[in-house]
């Protein structure tokens, strides 16, 4: 308990450590958000792939799946970068 209180006091006293603590918190939130969006992206692409697998032309469905996956990945990456920039700056 004393160690925890002492650690909290050092964060309050030295702004450099307090800033690093805040940055660590923001980075943890950013990584959690990244994992969440990656899982959502994978689920969406898998559902799109299942719809396309019912079609007759497997090659066309595979190509469209990868194109949709690439577009969604770019969209999520853009969203993540904007959220990260808002958090940090």
Curated annotation (Swiss-Prot):
Name of protein: Uncharacterized membrane protein YuaP
Membrane topology recorded in Swiss-Prot or TrEMBL: Single-pass membrane protein
GO CC terms in record: membrane
Entry keyword set: Membrane, Plasmid, Transmembrane, Transmembrane helix
Source species of the chain: Escherichia coli (strain K12)
Transmembrane regions: 20-39
Compartment annotation: Membrane
Top-level lineage group: Bacteria
